[in-house]
Regions:
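Pre-NBD coupling/linker segments of ABC/ABC-like ATPases
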Residues: 228-242
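ABC-type nucleotide-binding domain
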Residues: 240-441
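Helix-loop-helix
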Residues: 61-76, 82, 145-219, 223-224
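An intracellular "coupling" helix at the cytosolic face of ABC transporter transmembrane type-1 domains
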Residues: 12-18, 32-45, 49, 53, ...
Length: 441
């Protein structure tokens, strides 16, 4: 349930929220940290619930036998508890550091796998291995350091236990000589004291696991503390509420976190229904950023982005994004069939709608020739398709259901001139009422 709740929360975050935590760190928290918390809770339920009853019961029985000898227990227990507290105080920050270094290793792994062709093209495998080795060495160093501190706990606890038992036998013998205690009572007292101290040792071992779980729980809590910038219970889009204009930018400025300067500075424009807006600019000029403000992937720094007469971030995000077909720069396809990828925007899209979208995107010609047509399997990331094929399927997916707004973010870079021209003409003729934003270099 924790993992599911965390996953739902992550999906409710804006791009800026995800950027703040980091994709690799989120994956690590969703997998490793939730497992660590789960193990800690399991250990707590099995041992921590039982141990207090053993300690309390044995302590009561020991006091009933001999109050003076029980003082030894009340000296030993705080000693062990104090060491447990000191170890927790020291190791929790160290466990957090270890997890952060695991995040770094996960980031390097992800980047290496995604950029393996570039790395090999520049013969940088050795450099990447060196960086990964350094990250792993950091994990090893911090793990050894925290392990050394945690290892103090068991020897100290057993030393206190043995000294306590020795003290009981010593002073118990004196009391037996004095006639105030019997041998049987002393034996019973030693057994009770052993139960108490062993229960404390079990708790001490549990603390090591629980300390890891506590550090992981804090990391998970950090993700939950990132508030969604868009309310999931906002208003629904009323496409009949305003015919013209459909999109308005009103003195919009935007800056990425820690970027230093604005990516977009005081931009204003209006797009009416059925119009096509072309945006051309150099690398880093803010074209893609501008496009991502329309579906409210990011919030503006100042000004308003208005769709159908209302600020986009006041809408329910699902309702807003159902009116928008968005094609990012990088074509993203998911494992499954062509049909399943095409139904991503509209779950109940019929084959007729899918084929119509594929034809508009100039993709039906090659999809129809695939081994199983719409049921052809797509490997992870579409690795069994060419760049142009992936782009055309990505474009077709955004066209399913005839969205009111279509955003093409430099999404035809892998297409030849003739195919690109045919695509633009098909969109204009097949979707005359759709407002189109085309971004290009």
């Amino acid at each position: 349930e924790l993992r599911t709740a965390l996953y739902k929360h992550i999906n409710s975050l804006s791009y800026s929220g995800i950027d703040r935590v980091g994709t690799s760190s989120i994956v690590n928290r969703l997998t490793n940290d939730t497992n660590t918390v789960q193990n800690g809770v399991n250990m707590f339920i099995r041992l921590a619930v039982r141990a207090p009853f053993l300690v309390i019961g044995a302590a009561v029985m020991a006091v009933m036998i001999d109050v003076k000898l029980s003082i030894i227990f009340f000296i030993a227990a705080p000693l062990i508890s104090g060491v447990i507290f000191l170890i927790m105080h020291k190791t929790i920050p160290m466990y957090k550091t270890t997890q952060k270094r695991l995040d770094r290793a996960a980031l390097l792994t992800r980047e290496n796998l995604e950029g393996t062709r570039v790395i090999r093209a520049f013969s940088r495998q050795g450099n990447e291995i060196k960086k990964f080795d350094e990250a792993v060495d950091g994990i090893t160093t911090s793990s050894i350091a925290v392990g050394k501190i945690s290892a103090i706990l068991n020897p100290f606890a057993f030393m206190v236990m043995n000294l306590g038992i020795a003290a009981i036998i010593w002073f118990g013998g004196i009391r037996i000589d004095a006639g105030s205690l019997t041998q049987g009572e002393l034996t019973a007292f030693v057994n009770y004291m052993t139960q108490i101290l062993l229960a404390l040792i079990v708790l001490a071992n549990l603390i090591v696991t629980f300390t890891k779980a506590f550090a992981s729980a804090n990391r998970i809590s950090e993700v939950f503390d990132v508030e969604p910038e868009v309310e999931s219970k906002g208003e629904n889009v009323d496409t009949a509420a305003s015919e013209r204009p459909i999109i308005e930018f009103k003195n919009v400025s935007f800056a990425y976190e820690n970027a230093g300067e604005d990516s977009i500075d005081n931009i204003s424009f209006t797009i009416n229904k059925g119009e096509t807006l072309g945006i051309i600019g150099g690398t880093g000029s803010g074209k893609s950023t501008l496009a991502m403000l329309i579906p409210c992937f990011y919030r503006t720094k100042s000004g308003e982005v208005v769709v159908y007469g209302k600020d986009v971030c006041k809408y329910d995000p699902d309702s807003l994004r159902r009116t928008i077909g968005y094609v990012p720069q990088k074509s993203v396809l998911f494992s499954g069939t062509v049909r399943e990828n095409m139904q991503l925007r509209k779950k109940d899209a019929s084959d007729e709608e899918i084929i119509a979208a594929l034809k508009t995107a100039q993709a039906w010609e090659f999809v129809s020739k695939l081994t199983n047509g719409l049921d052809t399997a797509i490997s992870q990331g579409g690795k069994n398709l060419s760049g142009g094929q992936k782009q055309r399927i990505s474009i077709a997916r955004a066209l399913v259901g005839n969205p009111d707004i279509l955003i093409l973010d430099d999404s035809s870079s892998a297409l030849d001139y003739a195919t690109d021209l045919a695509l633009r003409r098909a969109i204009a003729s097949d979707m005359p009422d759709t407002t189109v934003i085309m971004i290009s270099q």
